[in-house]
A protein has these predicted regions:
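A generic local structural motif
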Residues: 1-3, 28-31, 99-100
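Covalent nucleotidyltransferase core used to form phosphodiester bonds in nucleic acids
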Residues: 4-7, 42-56
Length: 118
């Protein structure tokens, strides 16, 4: 059965599981996300930039869970400035009603893309 990614895109959080590059142990984080169903691109922003352990571990077969649905994928940095800005805009637009100021996060966080497997 095919999962409707449009429905999952409205969820508040996704869970990103990475494999520790040192320990080999799985690590799961809850994170805000934006999903573009047509391209199967899942966007997240790392407030810690490329220093965050989960970002360092992402390139080793990340798994994404949204509302109980699991996906494998390939992680990468945004392809170009257009995709970089798209990721930032989609995430801030989705969470703009959340408490706190998102403008600094939008400007300084590292956009990360996970291309979800079919």
């Amino acid at each position: 059965m095919m999962v409707d990614l449009r429905t999952l895109a409205d969820e508040d959080f996704c869970y990103l599981t990475t494999t520790g590059r040192v320990t080999g142990a799985p690590h799961e984080i809850e994170i805000w996300f934006s999903l573009v169903p047509e391209t199967r691109a899942l966007y997240v922003l790392s407030g810690g930039g490329d220093r965050s352990d989960w970002v360092k571990n992402l390139h080793r077969n990340p798994e994404v869970r949204i509302a109980g649905e699991r996906f494998g994928g390939q992680a990468r940095e945004a392809r170009d400035t257009d995709e970089d800005e798209l990721a930032r805009r989609l995430l801030v637009d989705k969470y703009e009603s959340s408490p706190g100021r998102l403008e600094n996060w939008r400007r300084t966080a590292l956009p990360v893309v996970v291309d979800l497997a079919e």
